[in-house]
Amino acid sequence: MIDWHIPTLHDFEAAQKAAEISHSMINDEAFSTIFLYRKKFGIMIAFRDGLMFRLYELEPENFYYTLPLGLDYSDSSMENLERLKDAVAALKSDADANRRRFKFILITDDKKALLEQAFPLRFTFTENPDFSDYVYNAQSMANLAGKKLQKKRNHVSHFMKTYSDVRFELINEHNTADALKIEDQWFSENNGEF
């Protein structure tokens, strides 16, 4: 059985180490993202055999597992494949014990390749654009030009009307305390949700 818990700041070092071993580059595997979105996405984590497992409850009783951090997904050695097989077996046992559908989320190309090598023809993969990282062109974001960014323009316009005395400042040693005060106020007003 996997001992799941809600991520806490005490998990940072172990999570960071696991992400480094996996050469993780996706936003969803950064501990800051895991920690900040733990409530919104019902994220639970567990550590076992040097690996960090994640479980998402995106909707009530709709769970998704992730492949663990702490494996090098570019390493197709027998030892690494065996560790992956053991990890997947542990996740499958957890799903069975808790009567959850056994399904994964956030499978990158390197993870997919190693998973297919370890479990030929065992899994079906479906791309879901709703779960994809997105990248904006810096020029587009700076100008908010075009129909695609209309909602963002409206949001900025509403913000500027609501907070007419807003100004942009780089955060430095002279205004760090003010920035933290504003962050604390915002955090309190939003019930601790980012």
What are these regions (language model features)?
Residues F12-R38:
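Intrinsically disordered, low-complexity, positively charged segments
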Residues F119-E193:
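Acyltransferase donor/substrate-recognition loop-hinge adjacent to the catalytic core
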Residues T8, F12, K152-R153:
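A structural signal for well-ordered alpha-helical scaffolds and beta->alpha junctions
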Residues H23, N27, D96-R100, R167, ...:
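Residue-level signal for secondary-structure boundary elements
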Residues D28-D110:
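Conserved donor-binding loop and adjoining core beta-sheet/short helix segment
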Residues A87-V88, Q117-L121:
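Short acidic (Asp/Glu) patches
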